[in-house]
Regions:
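Conserved short acidic donor-positioning loop in nucleotide-sugar-dependent glycosyltransferases
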Residues: 10-13, 32
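A beta-strand edge to alpha-helix "cap/lid" segment located at domain peripheries
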Residues: 28-29, 35, 41-105
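Amphipathic alpha-helical repeat scaffolds
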Residues: 4-8
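Absolute protein N-terminus
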Residues: 1-2, 105
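Residue-level detector of alpha-helix boundaries and kinks
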Residues: 2-3, 25, 29
Length: 105
């Protein structure tokens, strides 16, 4: 389903695939950050180009997925520190409509 394709797109740094999964009205929300689809894609492009996104340091666990929504738990290894985040996805027209992210350590 969508989460598997999303994970593949992130792991392979495939912006074309990621963009195709996002609804035209997609919004990304993380704490006080709000990005449109265009802003999110541009931000990921910068992270991929600069090497600040490293899939080898990330473990992704699919918590659940239905036709309307899904959730991932993502664990990022930074040296001796583990950063854990929850990412909830809401779907519309079989695309990612909203992504809500909450970090915790």
């Amino acid at each position: 389903m969508l989460l598997q394709k999303f994970s593949e797109g992130m792991t392979n740094k495939d912006l074309q695939l990621l963009d195709s999964l996002l609804h035209e009205e997609m919004l990304f929300l993380q704490d006080t950050i709000l990005e449109t689809k265009e802003q999110w894609v541009k931000d990921m492009e910068i992270q991929f180009e600069k090497g600040t996104f490293d899939a080898s340091k990330i473990d992704v666990i699919t918590k659940f997925e239905t036709k309307e929504m899904g959730a991932l738990e993502i664990i990022i290894k930074e040296g001796d520190t583990l950063l854990r985040l929850s990412s909830v996805f809401l779907y519309k027209d079989d695309k990612i409509y909203r992504q809500l992210v909450k970090y915790s350590s």
